[in-house]
Amino acid sequence: MSVELWQQCVELLRDELPAQQFNTWIRPLQVEADGDELRVYAPNRFVLDWVNEKYLGRLLELLGERSEDVTPSVSLLIGSKRSSAPRAVQPASPPPAVVQAAPVAIEEASAARTVDAQPVAPATVRTERSVQVEGGLKHTSYLNRAFTFENFVEGKSNQLARAAAWQVADNPKHGYNPLFLYGGVGLGKTHLMHAVGNHLLKKNPNAKVVYLHSERFVADMVKALQLNAINEFKRFYRSVDALLIDDIQFFAKKERSQEEFFHTFNALLEGGQQVILTSDRYPKEIEGLEERLKSRFGWGLTVAVEPPELETRVAILMKKAEQTKVELPHDAAFFIAQRIRSNVRELEGALKRVIAHSHFTNHPITIELIRESLKDLLALQDKLVSIDNIQRTVAEYYKIKIADLLSKRRSRSVARPRQVAMALSKELTNHSLPEIGDSFGGRDHTTVLHACRKIAELRETDADIREDYKNLLRTLTT
């Protein structure tokens, strides 16, 4: 079997996966042919296990479809194709079912690796751009040039938001107006907003693009009232090509500011100018905000930005390490991503601490170094999210007793919440499958594994389960 055939199948898989998943898990693989067998090398155990569980089955299907009468034989190894004398190891979990494929050997090739962890301070460059309109009023729009579409890591949690933002940036005035992005802190809403502004200016350097926090809008209005210059204030904000306002929830209970923004908003939309807004919650849930504003925010497209899933968290860490010219091993990124789950800001903050610790101690980035540099943060995470806490939260959410989760009852009203609780325990704690099973009435690890896979399937097909899981995840991690 040829390497070229493998590469063809990899290219087909590339079309099926988000870019960051492909770059994180598939691109690092190396391959060489040995007669009818292909040897595929992963850089470490974490990549090997993940590829084996998530992607190898599909790759074998593609190989089987294109290798005619030859049954594809693939060995998955740890190391590189320059390594010699591979030694067999047992897989951490059974490989996925494949179609007409020979058993996959999972092996390990010894390969020494060193990490040169020299931190480079990330550049944060802001574009201070004065926008001037008739009447002489000037305003400096602080767009952060570091926030672009190119360095935004896309995943399931932000895929729709990113696509909508790109549509607005590439086709302003004819896309979604207004575009309303909402979600918790540190999830990428501001990044997308800056990315839109930067792209608009790249396409048209003379465009009047204004980015500001909602409190700045309030401060400008108050100052205009004090200076008896409210007409200039109105003229300025209603003449821009794109108005980008962050954290719109701060307009709550500010009646005069809401009144002025209401008329500004109407004028901009009537003039075909683009409006992008962000908030930490769905517009209908912003208390103290006038109903007419909530209604108008729904005229365009409202998109949620969710906390990133594990694959996206790993990709974010690898991307950040690449930007700062630090070599971050995959297993180290995986270790951090498994434990820091709440938002991107905390994830990047944890990575900065690890890089600094590596630099000051002159030691490479390893799991041991990460444990030491993040010991207070990891201890807090373990304290906040425990299996007991998950069981209590799930029981309250579904209005059942904790004893029901631990019982042998198999009715749907109990079995499904139990499976949800097991899946959350696997995602949010560091306990092994047997430990989780033992915490749920002495069940074995295969029951936990089945529950996790079942909930993963239902989250793709059942809107109610997907919403339940999202709500519980938010409750447990915020």
Swiss-Prot record:
Keywords of this entry: ATP-binding, Cytoplasm, DNA replication, DNA-binding, Lipid-binding, Nucleotide-binding
Subcellular location: Cytoplasm
Annotated residues for binding of ATP: 186, 188-190
Gene Ontology CC terms, in alphabetical order: cytoplasm; plasma membrane
Region (Domain II): 91-141
UniProt-listed CDD domains: AAA, Bac_DnaA_C
GO molecular function: ATP binding; ATP hydrolysis activity; DNA replication origin binding; lipid binding
Gene3D superfamilies: 1.10.1750.10, 1.10.8.60, 3.30.300.180, P-loop containing nucleotide triphosphate hydrolases (3.40.50.300)
Pfam families: Bac_DnaA, Bac_DnaA_C, DnaA_N
Swiss-Prot/TrEMBL GO biological process terms: DNA replication initiation; regulation of DNA replication
Region (Domain I, interacts with DnaA modulators): 1-90
Region (Domain IV, binds dsDNA), start-end ranges: 359-478
Subunit relationships: Oligomerizes as a right-handed, spiral filament on DNA at oriC.
NCBIfam families xrefs: DnaA (TIGR00362)
Biological role: Plays an essential role in the initiation and regulation of chromosomal replication. ATP-DnaA binds to the origin of replication (oriC) to initiate formation of the DNA replication initiation complex once per cell cycle. Binds the DnaA box (a 9 base pair repeat at the origin) and separates the double-stranded (ds)DNA. Forms a right-handed helical filament on oriC DNA; dsDNA binds to the exterior of the filament while single-stranded (ss)DNA is stabiized in the filament's interior.
Family classification: Belongs to the DnaA family.
Protein name per UniProt: Chromosomal replication initiator protein DnaA
Source species taxonomy: Bacteria, Pseudomonadati, Pseudomonadota, Gammaproteobacteria, Pseudomonadales
